[in-house]
């Protein structure tokens, strides 16, 4: 597990690149997502094709993956900062929602947070490292300007972060799709 400090108050973004069932998950979901209609109709922060907030697909692989995300949460040192200062019993975390985002050329996501959730995650199901990154924006007090922390969209990478962190995705400029699965945890 890797982490990157995002803000001066020690909030961190955690990520890992080796989900061991990535190929099975991709095989199970790719056709469903590539051909999915834009249920959200670009009325959310995601200006790309998006599924329902709770993806409507029966998938053993997706169920295993979501359980793996909750297991990943068990390894995060929650004393390193977050949106909420009260102690969270990590054994009681549960998945609130899980949706897919399908970025085609010209698509993007505007700056937003996932409040009132506690933690959120993004998984790069189909991507290349040169595709649009996930950007976490913050105010640099010392330099008195906005800065960004860039997370490369490496296929099979899971990124977990406090839901209060501002994040966005720049315009996707490639012909192939960039597909993520995202969710919130409480």
Residue map of PLM features:
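Non-heme Fe(II)/2-oxoglutarate
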Residues: 1-90, 108
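Short beta-strand-to-coil "C-cap" segments at the C-terminal boundary of structured domains/repeats
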Residues: 18, 185-186
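Catalytic core of non-heme Fe(II) oxygenases with the double-stranded beta-helix
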Residues: 92-171, 176-180, 186
């Amino acid at each position: 597990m890797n982490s990157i400090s995002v803000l001066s108050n020690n909030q961190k973004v955690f990520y890992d690149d080796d989900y061991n069932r990535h190929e099975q998950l991709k095989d199970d979901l790719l056709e469903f997502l590539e051909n999915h209609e834009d249920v959200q109709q670009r009325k959310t922060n995601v200006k790309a094709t998006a599924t329902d907030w709770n993806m409507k697909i029966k998938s053993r692989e997706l169920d295993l993956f979501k359980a793996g995300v909750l297991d990943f949460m068990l390894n995060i040192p929650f004393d390193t900062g977050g949106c909420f200062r009260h102690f969270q019993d990590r054994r009681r975390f549960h998945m609130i929602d899980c949706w897919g985002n399908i970025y085609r050329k010209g698509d993007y996501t505007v700056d937003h947070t996932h409040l009132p959730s506690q933690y959120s995650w993004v998984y790069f199901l189909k991507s290349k490292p040169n595709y649009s990154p996930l950007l976490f924006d913050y105010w640099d007090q010392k330099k008195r300007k906005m800065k960004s922390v860039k997370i490369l969209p490496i296929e099979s990478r899971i990124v977990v972060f406090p839901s209060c962190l501002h994040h966005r995705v720049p315009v996707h400029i490639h012909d192939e799709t960039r597909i993520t699965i995202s969710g919130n945890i409480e």
